[in-house]
A protein has these predicted regions:
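Alpha-helical bundle segments that constitute or directly flank the non-heme di-iron/ferroxidase center
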Residues: 1-8, 25-44
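Structured surface interface patches that mediate subunit assembly and partner/cofactor docking
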Residues: 7-16, 20, 40-52, 64-71, ...
Length: 189
């Protein structure tokens, strides 16, 4: 994602992102916040929502924001690597394991990089193998999805419609708890 975003530094980061309430810079700031928020929760094994400081310094330019994104991704990756598989921490979609935090972070990074690309008219190609793993981990309630993995991930995140499947509304959700705990029902139903 950083390899895609860094060359866009000179573009208009205040450009709106289609179908979001944020512009490109606000979407980038959200990405930075999610990585730190996930890391803080998993590292602490909190059973409740933490009041994690989430606002990136408003004075940072795009280069500074991208550096922060890289740093926050690295912190989260280290926390995930060091967490035992049985670790759990709070997320509004349930007590989440390291694999769930990893999948949520990947979903955020892939989909919001795609969003930023749309806002800047610079198409971002989601990697199919990673998209498939994220879909199978976070969205077991909708499997199988008979389409390309990148389109499946975008559909699961409410970004596109698929043949025979209308675009999901803003209240879509994912399964962040261990897949073994899923009872076969749609958590949003």
């Amino acid at each position: 994602m950083l390899g895609f975003l860094r060359p866009l530094r000179g573009r208009a980061w205040h450009a709106p992102v289609p179908d979001l309430e944020w512009n490109c810079e606000e979407t980038l700031r959200h990405l930075i916040n999610t990585q730190l928020w996930y890391a803080a929760h998993l590292a602490s094994r909190s059973t409740r929502r933490l009041a994690v400081w989430r606002d990136v310094d408003p004075r940072l330019d795009v280069d500074g924001l991208l550096d922060n994104l890289e740093a926050h991704i690295s912190v989260l990756a280290a926390v995930i690597r060091d967490a035992p598989p049985e670790a759990r921490s709070w997320h509004n979609s349930g007590m989440t394991d390291p694999c769930g935090f990893s999948a949520m972070a990947c979903s955020e990074l892939l989909v919001h990089t795609w969003d930023i690309g749309r806002g800047m008219d610079a198409p971002f190609a989601l990697p199919g193998d990673l998209s498939a793993r994220v879909v199978s981990r976070l969205f077991p309630m909708w499997l199988p999805i008979d389409t390309a993995p990148d389109q499946a991930l975008l559909w699961c995140n409410g970004r596109v419609a698929l043949p025979g499947r209308p675009r999901l509304g803003p209240d879509w959700g994912w399964w962040s708890r261990p897949v073994e705990e899923w009872d076969g029902t749609d958590p949003d139903a």
